[in-house]
């Protein structure tokens, strides 16, 4: 059950992102900051949530490989979402949005590793941040 619960945040985040990108720009409320910053922050969250799909030991033994996996997963989802937006009336696909998605996924992966490393250093066991 714990493994399923750890996977839900990434799936829910992807669902919300897909839903929001399915509406026209007029129907999606956006704050007055750059949309690239919104992409970066949202996809960093997605990347962080994807870190929960991998075992804690993998992060501690091969962190660069794990960060690469998370970045590639988020990059693939971001690309599919940008292509999806191309077909939504009033929206468009943007390579710069996708690059912000990829950068966010990378930062989320790094944040997941740093969190795991800190928990290991302070000796917290089974904190729920990543799979055991």
Where are these regions (language model features)?
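Bulky hydrophobic segments
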Residues: 1-89, 95-98, 102-132
């Amino acid at each position: 059950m714990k493994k399923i619960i750890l996977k839900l945040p990434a799936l829910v985040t992807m669902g919300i992102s897909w839903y929001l990108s399915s509406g026209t720009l007029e129907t999606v409320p956006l704050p007055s900051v750059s949309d690239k910053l919104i992409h970066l922050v949202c996809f960093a969250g997605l990347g962080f949530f994807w870190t929960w799909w991998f075992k804690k030991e993998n992060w501690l033994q091969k962190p660069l490989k794990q960060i690469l996996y998370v970045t590639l997963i988020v990059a693939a989802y971001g690309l599919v979402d940008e292509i999806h937006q191309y077909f939504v009336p009033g929206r468009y696909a943007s390579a710069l949005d996708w690059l912000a998605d990829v950068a966010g996924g990378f930062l989320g992966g790094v944040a997941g590793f740093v969190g795991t490393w800190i928990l290991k250093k302070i000796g917290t066991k089974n904190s729920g941040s990543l799979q055991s």
